[in-house]
Amino acid sequence: MELEERRAALDVRRLPGLTPYAEAWELQRELVRKRRSGEIPDTLLLLEHPPVYTVGRAARDASNLGAGEEYLRSLGAEVFWSDRGGDATFHGPGQLVGYPIIRLKVRDTHRYLRDLEEVVIRALAGYGLEGRRHPRYTGVWVNGSKICAIGVKFSSGWIASHGFALNVNTDLSWFDRITPCGIREYGVTSLERELGREIPLAGVEREIVSGFREVLGDPGS
């Protein structure tokens, strides 16, 4: 039996505390290499970042960073130009970030994005919230505002990395300084805002993992 076959199960890793974006980025690169070679199974990283604005490959310039990188750094946030898909967004405490490092069983990048949306939609349903897709934009929306951003990278061997950022108890004022995902006509929201109370992240993590296994199963098996 090949090593790849022996390692079909999903490995879920919860990183403690706040993980700097650059550190998580380097970890993903290492895990992508190991996943490609079959050294590790499909892996889902769950974590929170300290305040950081990231800009994806869809951005043509820094125009969606509001007053600019220097100003954003003066607020106490990092600015990182990432190799993920998508445009500008914010990550910070109270936001659950998921980075699935998986080999796609179905080699369809658009379907994978819809699957990630479905994972989040099912997690939100566990809290009585109706998550919706938008006909023009990737992500998940609640009551007309974006609650989850999605940006993914696909590497050789059909290995996916990066993933989603779900606003749970996020300080949404950080988004006021940028044009999130380059979308001017809609705002952002969080579970805390929608439900009127702080939501324990551990419960959201359980819903995400459950939804991930329901929707994607063992993606690389």
From Swiss-Prot:
Name any Gene Ontology BP term.
Answer: protein modification process
- State its location(s): Cytoplasm
Q: Which amino acids does the record list as binding substrate?
A: R84, G85, G86, D87, A88, T89, F90, H91, A149, I150, G151, G163, F164, A165
Q: Where is the active site?
A: C181
Q: Identify one Gene Ontology CC term for this UniProt entry.
A: cytoplasm
Q: Name one Pfam family in it.
A: LplA-B_cat
Catalyses which reaction(s): octanoyl-[ACP] + L-lysyl-[protein] = N(6)-octanoyl-L-lysyl-[protein] + holo-[ACP] + H(+)
Keyword tRNA processing on this protein? no
Keywords assigned by UniProt, alphabetized: Acyltransferase, Cytoplasm, Transferase
User: In which pathway is this protein known to take part?
Assistant: Protein modification; protein lipoylation via endogenous pathway; protein N(6)-(lipoyl)lysine from octanoyl-[acyl-carrier-protein]: step 1/2
Highest taxon, organism lineage: Bacteria
Q: Write down the position(s) of the site called Lowers pKa of active site Cys.
A: K146
Q: What does this protein do?
A: Catalyzes the transfer of endogenously produced octanoic acid from octanoyl-acyl-carrier-protein onto the lipoyl domains of lipoate-dependent enzymes. Lipoyl-ACP can also act as a substrate although octanoyl-ACP is likely to be the physiological substrate.
Q: Which family does it belong to?
A: Belongs to the LipB family.
Additional comment: In the reaction, the free carboxyl group of octanoic acid is attached via an amide linkage to the epsilon-amino group of a specific lysine residue of lipoyl domains of lipoate-dependent enzymes.
Protein name in the entry: Octanoyltransferase
